[in-house]
A protein has these predicted regions:
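Polytopic transmembrane helical bundles with strong interfacial aromatic enrichment
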Residues: 2-143
């Protein structure tokens, strides 16, 4: 892909955000599939292997979503208006406390905020494994991302 870089144009945040979005999508699909396989497995060793893969995939997904949140905040707070989302939903005159509300003003930011809170819920479910088994984690996490 041949891209023209203009003076004072910041392309890396957008490329990083795009990569993190794709990574979170793939990791969520792997986590959902792995939790389902763990739930339907009859052997304990196979179930444990699928659960381990599912947890790793979900942690990767959560880190990608949290990082994407940080990248979008970087774009908004530094007023990188070459990105449509920052151009449409923020302003240089906004005080710092209102820049955070720019996240959920647009559809993309609302979806990112929704994914963020689902990742927080999933991390809580994974942290309380003794109370919630892989079946509950798979249902909640799978329902959140599919």
């Amino acid at each position: 892909m041949n891209t023209t870089k203009f003076i004072d144009e910041h392309l890396y945040p957008g490329q990083i955000g795009y990569f993190l979005t794709i990574l979170s999508l793939i990791a969520s699909l792997v986590a959902t599939y792995s939790f389902a396989k763990a739930f339907f497995s009859k052997e304990i060793s196979v179930q444990a292997a699928w659960e381990k893969l599912a947890k790793i995939a979900f942690i990767i997904e959560s880190l990608a979503v949290f990082s994407c949140f940080i990248v979008l905040f970087y774009i908004i707070s530094n007023h990188l208006f070459e990105y449509k989302y920052a151009y449409m939903h923020s302003d240089k005159n906004l005080p710092f406390e209102y820049l955070l509300s720019c996240f959920w003003e647009g559809q993309e930011g609302s979806f990112l905020l929704w994914s963020f809170w689902h990742c927080v819920l999933g991390v809580v479910l994974l942290a309380t494994k003794k109370k919630w088994g892989s079946s509950m984690a798979g249902v909640k996490i799978g329902r959140a991302h599919v």
